[in-house]
Amino acid sequence: MRILLFEDYSRLHTLIAKGLRELGHEVTLVGNGNMFHGLQRDIDIRRGSGPLAGIRHLIRLTSLLTRFRGYDIVQLINPDCFGLKAEREYPFYRFLRRHNRKVVAGAFGCDWYWVDNGLHHKTFRYGDFYIGDTMRTDAAAQTFIDEYCDTPKGDYTRYVMEDADWIPTCLYEYQACYGRYFPVKTQFIPLPIETECSQPVHAFDGK
């Protein structure tokens, strides 16, 4: 199969790409290197800096569109993976949907569903927004609320997740969350782990 992996978190897509290639699939990884992590990618969409960075990034993404079609599967690391304001990401997602067979949207990090579940369903005894029955009011929790609740970014996230063909979750916490909203198309797929090491690891003997 031809598979397009869009963006990466903590080498998740890097390791998936490696495994799929070993199985004989053609894989293209697009991303910004997960920012300062500098992860490997086949097509670089790292956004620059400066007052015109957004416009330059938009032009570059548009120029690359022909390379993002004709795949059997496109997997997004997160709905918000193009490096643009949410209002400007719709056309790029729709292009991927229109010109590829299947679109998979990963539940691999925070988005509207994670925030909504944490605020209103409290699936876990403690989490990003509650500890027991006490709501967190610290800056870290409020940042996620401000980012996704009643915002264009939250609306865009819901649009993509509702439209996607499949939603893989990489942690059981995400499965418990997304399974509430999408019980049919949500599937738990554990994080890939690379067991081979280029350098030997020596156990610490305490001396």
What are these language model-derived features?
Residues A105-D150:
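Acceptor-binding helix/loop patch of EC 2.4 sugar-transfer enzymes
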